[in-house]
């Protein structure tokens, strides 16, 4: 299959691993996302149907992957080929419900949002497709496990007044860790987790993150906060991964599993086996291709009146190019939620009016 892939290229993003998995499965992938220093691409204003029409070989599928760095090109609903999207951060913004209506088949990373997106899209071609690990990158390097606790994540989050930031500080004060504030390459992520006895995870909004799969794939015990979104279907809690309830429980369980090496390693081995058996990007893309190939319904935006299509695209545009950018700026300034609202609203209103 020839797949036209739209996302923002970045070597630690899910899109990067998805592209490699599709290629490993024998598919031809043409990148038509945003340009960057590593590869050519297209501006957000270029209609995607024109891009696809100009390709030397007609694709069999257009796949758009969130987050795409504010890349949501016009013309998706005019594409003469099946379209699909993989919405990852569904827990962070409801604009994705409007974006989903532009695609024939919709995949979301968090199970608890299935019903909401099925209602928004208006048909049942909306599927749960959890995140995963890339075993060529996220693997056990068989290095000495010199860190009690390992964590690789968003640097900006470490500076915010969040549960994740607070817990990272508590861990760093008590245990030997890697440098939480450093930016790591994909290969370095695998090495850090291979050097960690325990991989710490704290979700942003109750989501099952990439870190759960990456840490287990590298042979570490993953200790994550208690969340829904199908976590207990993906792993057997207590046998393949461990969960904590609060700060105190987190610290106590870290100390316990550091002191009980055989028990820790048994859970780590079981978690690793489960991930490699069921939770790689190869597994996810096999399911995605199967479901797309068996789909029969069309995206709502292919047939709705132009005015409705314009309103939906406008909502997506406002969030991608205005609201999300303003929220990011406010967060980077260290503002609390009330301060963010006061800072964002005047600027947003000015942009909408002008």
Residue positions per predicted region:
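C-terminal amphipathic helix plus adjacent low-complexity
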Residues: 259-354
